Amino acid sequence: MNYFPIFANLAGRPVLVVGGGSVAARKISLLLDAGAQVRVVANQLNAELSALAAENKILWLAEEFRAEHIRTVFLIIAASSDQALNRRVFQLAESCQKPVNVVDDRDYCSFIFPSIINRNPIQIAVSSSGSAPVLARLLREKLEALLPHSLGDMAEISGRWRDAVKAKLKSVTERRRFWEKQFNGRFAALVKNQQTAQAEQELAKQLEQNYQGGFVSLVGAGPGDAGLLTLKGLQEIQQADVVLYDALVSDGILSLVRRDAERIFVGKRARGDRTPQEDTNALMVRLAREGRRVVRLKGGDPFVFGRGGEELETLARHQIPFSVVPGITAAVGATAYAGIPLTHRDYAQSAVFVTGHRKADAPDIEWQTLARSRQTLVIYMGALKAALIAERLQQHGRSPDTPAAVISQGTLPAQKTATGTLANLAELAETAPNPALIVIGEVVGLHEKLAWFGENGEGENRVGQAYPALGGLNAGQRAA
């Protein structure tokens, strides 16, 4: 972090600006908006600043800059056209340990100005630490388009209601949960539509009826890449009091969890320690009964070999309210990143997902169905049984020459895709790090041509990177 982001209270504080031209005027406009008492040292002022001086909105010191000018001010901005003067201002300010900014000269600044999105009292600052000001400006423009102007009104109304909410809801957790609900509900919609009176009535109603019970949200984290987490999933993990996560949730996803939320690992791996499912179920119920907002965060999609159905049955049995946020399952995400289409008009008219890890008393797999040609077979948690899988498929008619792949660490920077055939599937799986996904079918043969991501991305049709910069800052921009 090159610069520490901080918001300064300038209301009523003296600020010195050296320079009387258009550059100085732009900074002075911001300072006046913040309530600063602006002193301008310059021999001449442009028309805009002259008008401000005539209206007594700024104090004009029509003289040469002197060291005495900086001694009684809070911060200093050098914005003259004289580079030598600007640098002298910097040196004197530094010697007095006063914050100083020389406009457009980063080496002579103890602080810099960010790009600002103003939804007063909500303010958002964007900075590239002076490295790429145009990029920071483009980001600001993108955020300006995304953020409704009603945010400021929403914040002002909320400020008026803070004391009432605090009196009604005693704990910080209760108050946070209440406001999260309002900012994502009907109150926010009313404010956006300029219906202020109705919005305040809605707040009063919600405060009176505020539900204090717990809640569980079953959230699919996707296959690993944090960029594949859904927007709804992100909202849920940033509103959680506690997150129960498994071993397939990547560090990138966990870094998005609200910082003060409790995180509890409840994962399991085929070769390692495991948290019994019954313990996880009981923990969800207990935490919800304590009135906490719980997120059960599961790799991939919670309803695709994630035992999500079993967990919801437990919650329903104990009358715990819940919701489900789907995620991108590994079979979809990992194969896409490996350049292996699950279906293709020339090679596969169907795709079948199956688990390689079954309950001990589960009925036998229908191998005849899985061995059909012109379909893609994706096997979760099958690496340890790869030899048996290959043997059974061949026994039921699948050719030993059928292309096969083992994808490890799918969608993550460490992703590896090992390809071969059904005949040597066991060898491919033996050296593959977990978590690994097995893909069998003619579509695997397209990997070499379509691979685009990571160290395997050497296909002849590779077109750049996973994400064009910022998704294309300009509408319609695509990878070249």
Swiss-Prot record:
InterPro entries: 4pyrrol_Mease, 4pyrrol_Methylase_sf, 4pyrrole_Mease_sub1, 4pyrrole_Mease_sub2, CobA/CysG_C, NAD(P)-bd_dom_sf, Siro_Cobalamin_biosynth, Sirohaem_synt_dimer_dom_sf
Binding site for NAD(+): S22, V23, N43, Q44
Highest taxon, organism lineage: Bacteria
Metabolic or biological pathway: Cofactor biosynthesis; adenosylcobalamin biosynthesis; precorrin-2 from uroporphyrinogen III: step 1/1; Cofactor biosynthesis; adenosylcobalamin biosynthesis; sirohydrochlorin from precorrin-2: step 1/1; Porphyrin-containing compound metabolism; siroheme biosynthesis; precorrin-2 from uroporphyrinogen III: step 1/1; Porphyrin-containing compound metabolism; siroheme biosynthesis; siroheme from sirohydrochlorin: step 1/1
Reaction equations catalysed: uroporphyrinogen III + 2 S-adenosyl-L-methionine = precorrin-2 + 2 S-adenosyl-L-homocysteine + H(+); precorrin-2 + NAD(+) = sirohydrochlorin + NADH + 2 H(+); siroheme + 2 H(+) = sirohydrochlorin + Fe(2+)
Species lineage: Bacteria, Pseudomonadati, Pseudomonadota, Betaproteobacteria, Neisseriales
Gene: cysG
Span list, region Uroporphyrinogen-III C-methyltransferase: 214-480
Gene3D superfamilies in the cross-refs: Cobalt-precorrin-4 Transmethylase, Domain 1, Methyltransferase, Cobalt-precorrin-4 Transmethylase, Domain 2, NAD(P)-binding Rossmann-like Domain, Sirohaem synthase, dimerisation domain, Siroheme synthase, domain 2
Name the record gives this protein: Siroheme synthase
Keyword entries, A-Z: Cobalamin biosynthesis, Lyase, Methyltransferase, Multifunctional enzyme, NAD, Oxidoreductase, Phosphoprotein, Porphyrin biosynthesis, S-adenosyl-L-methionine, Transferase
Modified positions (Phosphoserine) in chain numbering: S128
Cystine connections: none
